[in-house]
Design a protein with these regions (language model features):
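Phosphate-/nucleic-acid-contacting segments
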Residues: 5-8, 12, 16-77
């Protein structure tokens, strides 16, 4: 079930991103609370997932709060 939350968060992030050149970027801010509601998990769990994704290089938070996705890293999980 734990992997399910990671997968659902990844799906929401990928669907929310727009392609700019060869980069996928999420410009609109999605609060941890909103993300938690979307994936049916607690805010704490979503925060942990986002922290793990950041540490693994799947996401990178840019100045101003936009999120850069590195899907190649996600697919290698």
């Amino acid at each position: 079930a734990l992997m399910g939350v990671y997968g659902r968060v990844a799906d929401v992030l990928i669907e929310s991103a727009t392609l700019e050149g060869d980069k996928k970027i999420i410009h609109e801010k999605i609060s941890r609370q909103d993300l938690a509601k979307m994936v049916g998990a607690s805010r704490e769990m979503v925060s942990r997932v986002m922290r793990d994704f950041d540490e693994q290089g799947f996401i990178q938070t840019l100045t101003g709060g936009a999120i850069l996705l590195n899907e190649r890293r996600a697919e290698s999980r």
